Regions:
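ABC ATP-binding cassette signature C-motif
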Residues: 1-239
Length: 239
């Protein structure tokens, strides 16, 4: 949930918007539209907590999944698969389970015993977090976004910008976030993946704010449109 009160946004001396008030509750799906330079991306960065507003308050409750245009977060050494699974705390557990399995193959009794003990503990935590069913769900999301198995096995630092963006989108969709803020989520997706994403967002029950030049995605997934005009400092709302 997001509650915005008396929001003001400036870039240098330029006033983009002021006196902005709105809420995003469960089931609210908002499309941000307007010409380039109207402040759509700037607004989403502020709503997500990436940048502060010039004035006003934003109350954020629950988990927020934010897809920027150029994702840079995450450990560059982390595998793409681990990045996605860690949205629910599963990725690091799988790494620990793998290490415990390797320890269980040791001929040294102390290392073997440590591996047995650790594997049992980590697997219990893994299952409590959704386990193999959640892992399969993450794999299905990745596949539907056109992410190949070979990409999932690579560290983030080796991925192209488009691949990195799809990994981040998959992570957010897998996260069960209460509110999603997506800046041009169809970028770098093929036609089949775009259709799948539309269906996913239509069935999503949380709050959604999306910037997109995909008219069909906006038309099929949102129930309110916020129009930003670079020449005015207000947001026009259409249901």
């Amino acid at each position: 949930m997001l509650a915005v009160q008396d929001l003001e946004i400036r870039i240098g001396a330029r006033l983009l918007m002021s006196g902005v008030n709105f809420r995003v509750d469960k089931g609210d799906k908002i499309g941000l539209v307007g010409r380039n330079g109207a402040g759509k991306t700037t607004l989403t960065k502020i709503l997500a907590g990436e940048n502060p507003p010039s004035a006003g308050t934003i109350d954020r409750q629950g988990e927020i999944g934010y897809l920027p245009q150029d994702p840079r977060t995450g450990d560059p050494e982390e595998l793409a698969r681990t990045r996605i699974l860690n949205a629910r705390g599963l990725g690091d557990l799988m790494v620990k389970m793998t290490q415990a399995t390797e320890d269980m193959g040791s001929i040294e009794e102390a290392i073997f015993d440590r591996g047995m003990k650790n594997y049992s503990r980590y697997e219990d935590e893994f299952q409590s977090a959704g386990g193999y069913a959640a892992e399969a769900e993450a794999a299905a999301i990745a596949s539907n976004l056109g992410i190949k198995e070979s990409i999932l096995s690579q560290p983030l630092k080796t991925l192209s910008g488009g691949q990195r963006r799809r990994i981040e989108l998959a992570r957010i969709l897998f996260s069960n976030a209460n509110t999603m803020i997506l800046d041009e989520p169809t970028n770098h997706l093929d036609a089949d993946s775009v259709i799948w994403l539309r269906d996913f967002l239509k069935s999503y029950t949380g709050g959604l704010i999306v910037i997109s030049h995909d008219v069909d995605l906006i038309g099929e997934t949102v129930n309110r449109v916020f129009y930003l005009d670079a020449m005015r400092t207000v947001i026009d709302v259409y249901n």
